């Protein structure tokens, strides 16, 4: 008979033991090795006492998986999933089950990281390249990005690009047609204010009346009208205006492309291509421009290059445009955006093929034709004379019609001017049209869908004017024409997955990235229709489940961060930075201090920080760090005093980007506050704070939180992410608002930073589940175990590699930096060589050359077991032994396993391999552990320079994949 109590047998803390990698016995073994008695002892040795929380968090007890699922099921059931015809950029979809199961719900796709190591990311790089091909084909332009966050932020990026490339250098006006989606205008205005641009809104035809650097048009527009802008665009371009277009991706299967009309930039949401609405996200935006603007494009771009064997290979192109290199001079602060969703959209296009997509688009248009025919037959007046999917009606009794609609569980678009609209989508069927007739006309209308259909077949429809009917063939590449069978599609997805290394294969120890477990139980609710199928602009009383979830998650985050309130809207970490800095900016303006525009940033900061500051209209001043990587207090004090009249804020990261808890963090906050500035604490390293300290307790005023790092949302191969901000009470009135949905916050009047009021709301259940399941004890123990794992690796490797920075008692926080520069001096082996060699050992490289060039930053997270840590340590020690052979001259500097890494099957099958000074076994099976779990890179080291000099960002011939 067991002596355990019933409470113990109920295993409420079982999830904690599943989430944390090392078990109790392994933890004690590791603690003994590093010289600590317990996790509490390690914490006391590592974290400065003056910033330790005086008491534990109060976020509730841990709970079991079944209990957590039952609780969130209760929340989900409070959402009312009506049939939504609201449109405005969000539409019902039928996610192909082969994509839902094999991509969206597959850790091989959702747990990978941004493809900085392209040799072990060829699968998703191919899928992203397909996305770029879809974007280019449908828009009729030359060069596409790998995705942006959403349509509205893409519009803001298009405006910024227009200013950068416009030859009308004296112009400062950006024109926005008055029929764009309101959330897009909202985000554009927010961004324009920071840049000092003037935004003029008016009828599209009036754009020619202004001296502009750029203009934005919606195609099709808010009420559904389709307009041929060819002549207008030509006139604008003659006047040196950069023409940007927000386009509907599904409509472009039938409509003349914006590129053919003369647009310079085309963007939009790819949500209609198989991605659920999700109460606003996450969705991928496409962004396409003329080739001449390629150096000014925002975001990632995937390009084709060659590897050392001369084979085609994919990689991220033109990275010198981006924030991690150009910092405040970057085109955008965007890091990666929505790669998982872009991949879903690309697979949707591959699975349906051009004919299938055209059939879907034609069905939507036919149903819209039938709806319009029925309504006009009954005397209703349409507000639009052309359409793809949206019918708008004016002069009707909107209140009565909307009441009938709500009673029938139908949402219509209700405009302020007495117009209502119906946007049809892929999920609409003929019985829905009959139901809409009932809702709009009342019972007894006598209309028959089949009769109208027969008439349209016989006599045609002019909903799309002849001049706007697409004539050119699209998606002609073989990839879009060979996988329409589910068997073939399943195998294609699997072939690509097999080329990529994700967390389902091995640890990804990227410093500052927190690649922890994304537990299956946390992911389950995201696919539920109660979360997936909600329109973000539905009435709030239909979204009571989401409201409860957001409120509870916000309360969790308030307690964890020590702030007073949280804004959920930012849909990436970079957007969170931007939103937090905007709150600071507006706070200063409210006090008559609009001149405060200096942002102090330590030289060790991530490149996103200065890029975000520039985006918020601030001027960056860099402060020095000392030899230990800490903020130089004297330099900070001097610059804060010198800039006191114009000081807006400081952006700092804690623990520092050097992986240590700086002892002087409170003094940093006090100095900045003394001179009238605010403290922005970057939440990138929050995984070393939760339960031990907090930004608010330290003295910061605002932070963004990377829910895709600390709070278990997966990285998706480069997105999605979420970057909500926590603020002290004095900044709460200045966080992002929204023009469409106003839930009653004191900040509702502020502009938006994302298209949807709650950003990528459908992935919030992941973070809610993470916190709910772990509870007070679990989140603290997770942080402590992250410290343990990092210090264990640091001490194990310190006998073989110099450790660059340590804090008190020679401890590191949740990550450590090893210095490879001395080895480069003695052997010629670079950090790149070591990173690629780790691929042969079955590992993704740690972060290279950040925050210090010539280093690797290692962050194991709490989720990795001692077995996996030891396997990684063994690999690093083995690599050090290989470097020793190079140092000793046993292997040439230019012909050794590191220089030639990674090794592929083609290498070891090559008879010429025998001329190398090392064996095939050394190349591909350097340790016994590798033999047991071999990952094969599918290409050799890729030539980045060749790829940028010979830029190609579209699908390569199919033979290159064979």
Swiss-Prot record:
Q: Which Pfam families match?
A: GcvP2_C, GDC-P
Q: Which domain of life is it from?
A: Bacteria
**Enzyme class, one word?**
oxidoreductase
- Molecular functions per Gene Ontology: glycine binding; glycine dehydrogenase (decarboxylating) activity; pyridoxal phosphate binding
List N6-(pyridoxal phosphate)lysine occurrences by residue. 709
Q: Which reaction does it catalyse?
A: N(6)-[(R)-lipoyl]-L-lysyl-[glycine-cleavage complex H protein] + glycine + H(+) = N(6)-[(R)-S(8)-aminomethyldihydrolipoyl]-L-lysyl-[glycine-cleavage complex H protein] + CO2
Q: Which GO terms describe its cellular component?
A: cytosol; glycine cleavage complex
Keyword DNA damage in the entry? The reply is: no
Keyword Oxidoreductase listed? The answer is yes
Q: What is its EC number?
A: 1.4.4.2
Keywords in alphabetical order, please. Answer: Oxidoreductase, Pyridoxal phosphate
What Gene3D superfamilies does the record tag this protein with? Answer: Aspartate Aminotransferase, domain 1, Type I PLP-dependent aspartate aminotransferase-like (Major domain)
One of the GO BP terms on file? glycine decarboxylation via glycine cleavage system
What InterPro entries does the annotation carry? GcvP (IPR003437), GDC-P_C (IPR049316), GDC-P_N (IPR049315), GDC_P (IPR020581), PyrdxlP-dep_Trfase (IPR015424), PyrdxlP-dep_Trfase_major (IPR015421), PyrdxlP-dep_Trfase_small (IPR015422)
Q: Enumerate the cofactors the protein uses.
A: pyridoxal 5'-phosphate
Q: What does this protein do?
A: The glycine cleavage system catalyzes the degradation of glycine. The P protein binds the alpha-amino group of glycine through its pyridoxal phosphate cofactor; CO(2) is released and the remaining methylamine moiety is then transferred to the lipoamide cofactor of the H protein.
Q: How does it assemble?
A: The glycine cleavage system is composed of four proteins: P, T, L and H.
Q: Belongs to which family?
A: Belongs to the GcvP family.
**What is the name listed in the Swiss-Prot or TrEMBL entry for this protein?**
Glycine dehydrogenase (decarboxylating)
Source species, please? Shewanella frigidimarina (strain NCIMB 400)
What is this organism's lineage? Answer: Bacteria, Pseudomonadati, Pseudomonadota, Gammaproteobacteria, Alteromonadales
Name the encoding gene, please.
gcvP
């Amino acid at each position: 008979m067991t002596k355990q109590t019933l409470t113990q047998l109920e295993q409420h803390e079982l999830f904690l033991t599943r989430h944390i990698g090392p078990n109790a016995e392994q933890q004690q073994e590791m603690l003994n090795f590093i010289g600590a008695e317990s996790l509490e002892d390690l914490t006391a040795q590592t974290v400065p006492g003056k910033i330790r929380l005086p008491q534990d968090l109060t976020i509730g007890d841990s709970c079991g998986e079944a209990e957590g699922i039952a609780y969130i099921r209760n929340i989900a059931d409070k959402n009312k999933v009506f049939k939504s015809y609201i449109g405005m950029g969000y539409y019902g979809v039928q996610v192909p089950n082969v994509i839902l199961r094999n991509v969206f719900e597959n850790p091989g796709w959702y747990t990978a990281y941004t493809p900085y190591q392209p040799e072990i990311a060829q699968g998703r790089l191919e899928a992203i390249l397909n996305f770029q091909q879809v974007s280019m084909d449908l828009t009729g332009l030359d060069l596409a990005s790998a995705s942006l966050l959403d349509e509205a932020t893409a519009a803001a990026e298009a405006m910024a690009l227009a200013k950068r490339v416009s030859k009308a250098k004296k112009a400062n006006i950006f024109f926005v047609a008055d029929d764009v989606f309101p959330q897009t205008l909202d985000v554009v205005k927010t961004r324009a204010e920071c840049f000092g641009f003037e935004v003029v809104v008016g009828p599209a035809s009036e754009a020619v009346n202004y001296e502009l650097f750029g203009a934005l048009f919606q195609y099709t527009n808010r009420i559904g009208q389709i307009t041929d802008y060819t002549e207008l665009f030509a006139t604008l371009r003659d006047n040196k205006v950069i023409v940007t277009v927000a386009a509907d991706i599904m409509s472009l299967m039938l409509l003349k492309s914006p590129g053919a009309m003369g647009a310079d930039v085309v963007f939009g949401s790819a949500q209609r291509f198989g991605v659920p609405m999700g109460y606003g996200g996450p969705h991928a935006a496409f962004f396409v421009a003329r080739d001449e603007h390629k150096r000014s494009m925002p975001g990632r771009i995937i390009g084709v290059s060659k590897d050392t064997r001369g084979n085609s290979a994919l990689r991220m192109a033109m990275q010198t445009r981006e924030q991690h290199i150009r910092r405040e001079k970057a085109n955008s602060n965007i890091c990666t955006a929505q790669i998982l969703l872009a991949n879903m959209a690309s697979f949707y296009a591959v699975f349906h093929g051009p004919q299938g997509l055209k059939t879907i688009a034609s069905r939507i248009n036919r149903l819209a034709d039938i709806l319009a025919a029925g309504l006009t037959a009954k005397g209703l007046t349409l507000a639009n004379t052309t359409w793809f999917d949206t019918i708008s009606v004016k002069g009707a009794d909107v209140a009565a019609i909307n009441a009938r609609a709500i009673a029938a569980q139908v949402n219509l678009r209700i405009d302020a001017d007495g117009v209502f609209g119906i946007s049809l989508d892929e999920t609409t069927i003929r019985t829905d049209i009959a139901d809409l007739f009932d809702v709009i006309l009342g019972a007894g209308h006598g209309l028959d869908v089949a009769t109208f259909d027969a008439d349209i077949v016989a006599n045609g429809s002019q909903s799309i004017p002849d001049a706007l009917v697409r004539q050119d063939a699209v998606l002609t590449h073989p990839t879009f024409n060979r996988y329409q069978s589910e068997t073939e599609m399943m195998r294609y997805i699997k072939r690509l997955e097999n080329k990529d290394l994700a967390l389902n294969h091995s640890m990804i120890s990227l410093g500052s990235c927190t690649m922890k477990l994304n537990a299956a139980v946390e992911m389950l609710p995201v696919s539920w229709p109660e979360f997936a199928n909600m329109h973000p602009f539905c009435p709030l009383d239909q979204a009571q489940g989401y409201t409860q979830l957001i409120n509870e998650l916000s309360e969790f985050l308030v307690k964890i961060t020590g702030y007073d309130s949280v804004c959920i809207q930012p849909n990436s970490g970079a957007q969170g930075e931007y939103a937090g800095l905007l709150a600071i900016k507006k706070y200063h303006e409210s006090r008559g201090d609009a001149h405060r525009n200096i942002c102090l940033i330590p030289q060790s900061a991530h490149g996103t920080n200065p890029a975000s500051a520039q985006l918020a209209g601030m001027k960056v001043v860099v402060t020095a760090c000392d030899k230990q990587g800490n903020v130089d207090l004297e330099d900070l004090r001097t610059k804060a005093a010198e800039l006191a009249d114009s000081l807006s804020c400081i952006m700092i990261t804690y623990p520092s980007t050097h992986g240590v808890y700086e002892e002087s963090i409170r003094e940093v906050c006090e100095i900045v506050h003394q001179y009238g500035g605010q403290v922005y604490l970057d939440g990138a390293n929050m995984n070393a704070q939760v339960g031990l300290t907090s930004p608010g307790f330290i003295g910061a005023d605002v932070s963004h939180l990377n829910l895709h790092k600390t709070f278990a949302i997966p990285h998706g191969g480069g997105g999605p992410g979420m970057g909500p901000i926590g603020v002290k009470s004095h900044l709460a009135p200045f966080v992002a608002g929204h023009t469409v949905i106003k839930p009653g916050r004191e900040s509702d009047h502020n502009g938006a930073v994302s298209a949807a009021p709650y950003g990528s709301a459908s992935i919030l259940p992941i973070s809610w589940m993470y916190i709910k399941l772990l509870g007070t004890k679990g989140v603290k123990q997770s942080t402590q175990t992250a410290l343990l794992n990092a210090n264990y690796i640091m001490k194990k490797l310190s006998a073989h590699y110099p450790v660059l920075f340590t804090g008190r008692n020679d401890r590191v926080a949740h990550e450590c930096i090893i210095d490879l520069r001395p080895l480069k001096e003695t052997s010629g082996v670079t950090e790149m060589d070591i990173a690629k060699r780790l691929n042969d050992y079955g590992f993704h490289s740690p972060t290279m050359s950040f925050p210090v060039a010539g280093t690797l930053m290692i962050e194991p997270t709490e989720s990795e077991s001692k077995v996996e840590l030891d396997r990684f340590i063994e690999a690093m020690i083995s690599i050090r032994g290989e470097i020793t052979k190079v140092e000793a001259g046993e292997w040439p500097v230019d012909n050794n396993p590191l220089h030639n890494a990674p090794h592929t099957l083609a290498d070891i099958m090559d008879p010429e391999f025998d001329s190398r000074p090392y064996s095939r076994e050394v190349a591909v099976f350097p340790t016994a552990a590798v033999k047991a779990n071999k990952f094969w890179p599918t290409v050799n080291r890729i030539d980045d320079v060749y790829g940028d000099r010979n830029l190609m960002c579209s699908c390569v011939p199919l033979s290159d994949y064979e």
